[in-house]
Amino acid sequence: MPSVMEKSHGSSAVISRNRAKSDSLGNSEEESSEDEAPRDSMIRVGSDYQAQIPECKPDNTSPSGNVELKGMLVWSPSQFVSDAKLNEYITMAKEKHGYNVEQSLGMLLWHKHDVERSLADLANFTPFPEEWSVEDKVLFEQAFSFHGKSFQRIQQMLPEKLIPSLVKYYYSWKKTRSRTSVMDRQARRLQAKREEGMEEVEDQIKMSDNETDVTETKKEAPVPQKVVSGAVSGKTGPVRKEPLISQYRHHPLRSRQRPPKGIHLNKSDVSAVCASSEMPAIALCQLETQLISLKRQVQNIKQMNSSLKESLEGGISEMRPPELNIKLNARWTTDEQLLAVQAVRKYGKDFQAISEVLGNKTPSQVKTFFISYRRRFNLEEVLQEWEAEQEPSPPPASTDMSNKTSGSSQTPNEEDDEVQITSVSSSSQPAPPAAAAAASLSLPPPLLRPAIPCAPTLHRQPPPLQPGRLLQPRPPPLVRPAPRQSPRAPPALVGSHAESTFS
């Protein structure tokens, strides 16, 4: 028991000590707060409580973070530099050195509007590249679509850009937004016109529906009976109708009913329709018949197009001409020889064209034919005729004179070489007229020999491979003209025709 009492007495002593310490601490805090309270509330007056202000130094610029925001003069126009010279300087600085307009003008202002010095100094500096990259521009557009003109929020998406640069780029970007191509403008106009036309049609449909509803209600409503009594209306005599309040009171132009898009009213047509009560029905019948005929034409054209498309689906292999397997042959048949002579008469020495006409001969084979058969088919004269056709034809008077001179200049050697069959006086032969001479000198059709002039029946015509001359008419072959100096007795083959010439 005494031990327990001692323990309890010791514990109570400890508790009392702790309580005493806490009371002493609380009292000290209260005293300190009471001491501080009068100190805070006192008025501080005197030199001890005043701030020491340094002297003003206007020349020294205080370092601050807003130095970049200060403006700097970039360009000031001067009367010593003309506009043409200034434009030339700007283009040269842009093309050669890559300066923009602002940088080039700043350089010119730095050199006090001396163009030559500024041009010489442009190569010593490298201009800043474009500050706004493609990514920056895209980010700016997105930020502007989100935040509008709140440039502080836009700067949060573009932290490396200053607000003045954002504002500057905004105004330059705003100008480019209004630039649209001509095609876009035209598309917008057409879209607006279509929308207006659709709105007009819808308004007319609504108006027509309203009119039909009004007519139906009028038909359904019973006809009121006339009641003659003073209690119905307080006024006697004609009653003035109250004007209906228009739906488009503020817009009187909209109250006008316009025809649908594409329909225009013509005064003559309206007067013709209003002439009689049957004219509208007749006009509608005519328009319906025209519409039916046009629909038939459209249907026929569609059927034709569908049939043509079906025929094209199979391809065009059936329409192609069959390929001829022509084999080259070195042998010349009679028909090929005659065709080659006519081709020489048509194309001259164009062996490629002649080979294409023949089909189974090469140009080299045609050339060898021309060389080997030159004398047999008289190809030199045929070639001369072709050359004469290529040259411009002389006038008819000169051709007549050449015919006379050629007829008189025949040599006796040519007369001796020919074989005499009959003698015919030159006076008995009638002179050909000018029209016949012109017809004989006309150009022949392609691949055909020229027409032979009319001659007596006893005279033989030359073979088809030896065409007659065009420029110098000569007597037919194997016929010799009779000599004029010593006329001889006619042979028995001529008969009475020769006797009449010498009588």
From Swiss-Prot:
Major location category of this protein: nucleus
Entry's localization field: Nucleus
This protein's GO CC annotations: histone deacetylase complex; nucleus; transcription regulator complex
Residue spans of biased composition, Low complexity class: 423-442
Residue spans of biased composition, Polar residues class: 399-412
SMART domains according to UniProt: ELM2, SANT
Annotated family: Belongs to the CoREST family.
Protein name listed in UniProt: REST corepressor 2
Organism (species): Xenopus laevis (African clawed frog)
